[in-house]
Regions:
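RNase H-like (RuvC/DEDD) metal-dependent nuclease/polynucleotide-processing core
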Residues: 1-201
Length: 201
């Protein structure tokens, strides 16, 4: 609700949503059938083409079912957000010269590309530090994660007092990399990679 309320007041905006824009349309299943794979391999094809391409590149992502009813709550919330944004006039990135643009992103995939490999576990302290540093080093105006280390003393460490207020939560870091991706799409489009099939979003 807060997101759509904020965006309603914007004349121009590019929004990157960290969720699938729709269900899978069976494109991966059809591709695998053409490649004459075994029925067991085809059964494991419940994903969209974008998810398949990410997995081919070693990036583990959740597959999107073919039915919205079978999708987890976070995916269904994403579908609802896309519908709301489209009703507000947002159009898919690069379709037209629209003032309000929308793109799908995947935070884990973004961090894998930016880190040059699979980053450390997202909820872990070191994973949060790594993600924050990746964004900070790319000029995103956020807290310098290295300040975290300046706040650690022997006393604080012995008492289990960590300056976690200097770090963003995993959810905030996901939102920040999505925003960074949207910014790149507008200002440095040559630095983003488009994957998947337009039929699936």
């Amino acid at each position: 609700e807060d997101v759509t309320a904020f965006l309603a007041g914007q004349q121009t905006a590019t929004v990157a949503v960290n969720a699938p824009s729709g269900v899978n349309r069976g494109l991966v299943r059809a591709k695998l059938k053409k490649e004459m794979l075994t029925p067991h391999q085809v059964r494991r094809a419940e994903m969209r083409m974008a998810e398949h391409e990410l997995r081919v590149h070693g990036i583990a992502v959740s597959g999107t079912p073919a039915s919205a009813a079978l999708c987890p709550a976070w995916m269904q919330a994403g579908f609802e957000l896309y519908r709301k944004l489209e009703k507000m006039g947002f159009e898919k990135l690069f379709e037209e010269e629209a003032e309000l643009q929308l793109l799908e992103t995947h935070s884990h995939a973004c961090y894998c590309v930016l880190a040059g490999g699979v980053p450390l576990s997202k909820p872990s302290l070191e994973g949060r530090l790594q993600r924050q540093l990746i964004l900070y080093e790319r000029g995103v105006r956020i807290k310098d994660p290295m300040d975290f280390f300046e706040e650690i003393t022997r006393y604080k460490l012995s008492k289990g007092i960590w300056p976690t207020e200097l770090l963003y939560s995993p959810e905030q870091l996901d939102a920040l990399v999505a925003a960074y991706t949207a910014w790149l799409a507008v200002t440095k489009a040559e630095n983003i990679i488009m994957i998947g099939d337009v039929k699936e979003g």
